[in-house]
Amino acid sequence: MDFPTRFDVIVIGGGHAGTEAALAAARMGVKTLLLTHNVETLGQMSCNPAIGGIGKSHLVKEIDALGGAMAEATDKGGIQFRILNSRKGPAVRATRAQADRVLYKAAIRHTLENQPNLWIFQQACDDLIVEQDQVRGVVTQMGLRFHADNVVLTTGTFLGGLIHIGLENYSGGRAGDPPSIALARRLRELPLRVGRLKTGTPPRIDGRSVDFSVMTEQPGDTPIPVMSFLGSKEQHPEQVSCWITHTNARTHEIIAANLDRSPMYSGVIEGIGPRYCPSIEDKIHRFADKESHQVFLEPEGLTTHELYPNGISTSLPFDVQLQIVRSIRGMENAHIVRPGYAIEYDFFDPRDLRYSLETKVIGGLFFAGQINGTTGYEEAGAQGLLAGANAALRSQGKDSWCPRRDEAYIGVLVDDLITLGTQEPYRMFTSRAEYRLILREDNADLRLTEKGRELGLVDDRRWAAFEAKREGIEREEQRLKSTWVRPNTPQGDAIAERFGTPLTHEYNLLNLLSRPEIDYAGLVEITGDAVDNPQVAEQVEIRTKYAGYIDRQQEEIARLRASEDTRLPVDIDYLGISGLSKEIQNKLNQARPETLGQASRIPGVTPAAISLLLIHLKKRASGRQLEQSA
């Protein structure tokens, strides 16, 4: 049977990628369907109960700047907030929040159910309707057909999902949920490169069976940070601490003695796991010289005793898991509520995608999240928003959009994936970005909100707050620039005494703020007229202190942008370009890069090859001009 309503965009999956994709498309005014196998699991945090961290919070803030839901849901569900790298420069500072799973999921569901243009339907998707290399809709488990020319797949770990505990395994999308077998089989029929990846999760612990008195308490920061640009600490629920303990020699002995019972080390698991979130057995094997590893006990929520022991993800048999847990200080009598496990799943080579996250072989079919080889809620949410927005743009007959590497971490993420591909679950770090001084988490709105408004992603409430902030920054910078302090005056003497900086002549306050020893709060305490908005004060201080470095980075970006953005024709014949080696011809022909900049980042493509490409493009353009004049 055909569903009576035709949609512009259909999103498959209600995880972090799917919810952001559906919300983005609906915000842009197109008729959107979110199809999920279970409405009760919309926005569920399948692994650790945390949002943000190094590189990841930058993505969350960018999602927020573009009108997404993740940051605001974190503020409503966050039970501990911390700023990581707070003593380092602003480029690498990151916000991290522990979240109450129930509160976070409720916030996401509330947002979904109150979003205009968005329909939600509970059914598993088993098939795609494809006609002449163009997607036309989907078919559910009960044979119901939904029609749309744009479909976003956000299947997480469900495609061919296989759960491992010891040498036993069974089909599943995650613990308690069925896998997507029929859809996985259908996707494998398409001309797309497919592989297997693996991720894992630790056993959950009953907090009543833990001795916290022998552990190190890790409270949140004061004052409490916020995640969203629209957030406030008044939104936060009760705040709680995490606790730190360590593995020990006994723990490592138990693991080493049972590696033959590990599905990873016995060859049962074929998929590659995340390098930067390894299982405890992987840590013991790879870092055999380390005597201990940290374990962070993270509360799962305010209304449960469950704890998430971050650092001991494992797929060893349950009896070994119990020995491991009880060998750790403070957990000698611990009760395991849920066993840890590993899960293998299908992913598709992201090099088969365009910058819009649309597949190159099937028009209107978009992929986002773990299906593209990434790991993490934040990476998934960022891709989901972009894919949903581009699906909406396509339905409106408009050009696709993706931020450049110098505009957003989302741009870095997508460019890395579609240019380089990935052999292991991809995680975002600040070190992946060349222009991280410009791509700070604190200025994500200044970089992206205006574009989001243009696309239709940003509502009036966010736009008004953004304009007020932007105007506040400009006004305060102008005030500091036009306010002067002279030596041998009460203000001049107070500045000299507080900062140890005698004034030799007249300075404006902006000049003084550029000095490393002078901070904004201390300066305006002496001179008066501080701004009320802490986001404005933060921006003024960072922009002033790092102005020289930022200007140099902007100049470098401007130099590179001309060649970076040069489009490569869809029909270009790389095999016919003389001067290119066969190896480079084949690499370019396989990757089919969209721009010269993307071509330059393909492994093995040399600067000389890029120069030859540029010459070829100029010859091609001049040849067409001659044809037109003739």
Swiss-Prot record:
One of its GO terms (cellular component) is cytosol. GO terms for molecular function: flavin adenine dinucleotide binding. FAD binds at G13, G14, G15, H16, A17, G18. Keywords: Cytoplasm, FAD, Flavoprotein, NAD, tRNA processing. InterPro entries: FAD/NAD-bd_sf (IPR036188), GIDA_C_N (IPR049312), MnmG (IPR004416), MnmG-rel (IPR002218), MnmG-rel_CS (IPR020595), MnmG_C (IPR026904), MnmG_C_subdom (IPR047001), MnmG_C_subdom_sf (IPR044920). Its cofactor is FAD. It is found in: Cytoplasm. NAD(+) binds at residues 273-287. Its main location: cytoplasm. GO terms for biological process: tRNA methylation; tRNA wobble uridine modification. NAD-binding protein involved in the addition of a carboxymethylaminomethyl (cmnm) group at the wobble position (U34) of certain tRNAs, forming tRNA-cmnm(5)s(2)U34. Belongs to the MnmG family. Homodimer. Heterotetramer of two MnmE and two MnmG subunits. This is tRNA uridine 5-carboxymethylaminomethyl modification enzyme MnmG.
